[in-house]
Amino acid sequence: MSRIGKHPAIALLDSGITFKEVRQIHAKLYVDGTLKDDHLVGHFVKAVALSDHKYLDYANQILDRSEKPTLFALNSMIRAHCKSPVPEKSFDFYRRILSSGNDLKPDNYTVNFLVQACTGLRMRETGLQVHGMTIRRGFDNDPHVQTGLISLYAELGCLDSCHKVFNSIPCPDFVCRTAMVTACARCGDVVFARKLFEGMPERDPIAWNAMISGYAQVGESREALNVFHLMQLEGVKVNGVAMISVLSACTQLGALDQGRWAHSYIERNKIKITVRLATTLVDLYAKCGDMEKAMEVFWGMEEKNVYTWSSALNGLAMNGFGEKCLELFSLMKQDGVTPNAVTFVSVLRGCSVVGFVDEGQRHFDSMRNEFGIEPQLEHYGCLVDLYARAGRLEDAVSIIQQMPMKPHAAVWSSLLHASRMYKNLELGVLASKKMLELETANHGAYVLLSNIYADSNDWDNVSHVRQSMKSKGVRKQPGCSVMEVNGEVHEFFVGDKSHPKYTQIDAVWKDISRRLRLAGYKADTTPVMFDIDEEEKEDALCLHSEKAAIAFGIMSLKEDVPIRIVKNLRVCGDCHQVSMMISKIFNREIIVRDRNRFHHFKDGHCSCNGFW
């Protein structure tokens, strides 16, 4: 061993030389006949296998020339394959270790790499078998193996198993604690993750990233941004992975100013902008209603993948630019990028917002005929929405009946919305009943059905719907509107008076109401589910969250700054009408992202053209 340890080739191989250089050294030693020691071969196997997964076949050829492959060489192949596109091949080399008789035995490295392979495969049964093997071979107390098992069970979504492994460790080290923080955050238990995180004497960027990502994942976007700010205060270096989570949190909140600041932070700190990070930036600007900036980032990217194109297409569709969405799709195909299933969801939405039924049908048909993509439930949902929005309700019903899979609630929701828009009571009742069969606690179905009855002043059935909700314990989800002013996020809830500036907001809203009435405003009271007089209904509508947000925006933002609002529910008819009128009376641009789409209100018009 001492002689081999002094071989100059080993020092070169361990110094991180390029694959080309490794190959040159290997060829020279092979030709000279000096490449006979199995230990030296093992170092070549490692150098080639770990350089890039595309060289794994070459590494295997080197291994096959070894008379007695070492455990080091076989472990290197397991390690390389566990991080490759084919992690299942790791087990081929594990079986070679077992078939060697008593010459070789798996060690803790073998087991750790196999656990990582299971993590890549996301196969529960295989993972359990490997865990059992670690116990039988006495490696279950190895800290590297334990950390790997925590990551494996987190990947499988088995948080209880993560806790069992973690609790079995007498003194978990820094790496193990970080893995557990990551596991809990990934599985949605941000409370325990934060508790463990706060108790760590030192925290590396991985732990910080896990907390930011975890909060963003469960929708606690404000807390995700708070952790990011704490990370900066403690001087922890922020990387591109963390910035993706930060940008995602800004996107959820519709916090465009903070998103812009995060973008400038990336540029100031020279964080490498990968395709994934740039795609997240496109998504941020698109979902905050700034399509101009989204497309600026998009066209400025040197490299784009199918997800980048799909993100831009989705942004254009969401913001009501259906024709531009279809133009971009044509450019995408001309650029040689093959669309995937996600792409077609965006394309079909683009057709829907501009009412291009025939073109939408052609794109739907091309999925299978031209690209070999089998349409899934979401694609059929888009097709139903396309026909329903265009008023072709019978065709929409026919598509639902002929779908190869059972329609989900969102499909019936599209038909229900259209039934109300086109005043088809019979189909509206059918769609709502189908929705409630699938989701008995879906408050939206009850509300829309009651609105359909209210449109025709059928207060007996409105009352029946309300009683049905009450008897089943279904409550209408309270409306919440979020907006950002000077980098600070403000939340407004329906009927809530807790905002510190409520008195000023109320005064501004009263002035807005006065000017609306002078302009001829008459409240659309159909969203109010009670048979009460019109004045009481108007009072109820005044409490809607986006109206408070608009009032706050008018009093807080300069006239040339758009008022941007994110709402958790679909905008009601009255708020939609009011927003259009305010945009004209006050000469303000108002951008509302509700649960369905964007509404760009300007000069008394909305980008949705009355259908949302």
Swiss-Prot record:
Gene3D superfamilies: Tetratricopeptide repeat domain. PROSITE patterns: PPR. Residues 518-612 are annotated as: Type DYW motif. InterPro entries: DYW_dom, E_motif, Eplus_motif, Pentatricopeptide_rpt, PPR_At4g14850-like_plant, TPR-like_helical_dom_sf. The keyword Repeat applies. GO terms for biological process: RNA modification. It holds the Pfam family DYW_deaminase. Residues 411-486 are annotated as: Type E motif. One of its GO terms (molecular function) is RNA binding. Keywords: Repeat. The keyword Acetylation does not apply. Residues 487-517 are annotated as: Type E(+) motif. Belongs to the PPR family. PCMP-H subfamily. This is Putative pentatricopeptide repeat-containing protein At5g40405. It comes from Arabidopsis thaliana. The lineage of its organism: Eukaryota, Viridiplantae, Streptophyta, Embryophyta, Tracheophyta.
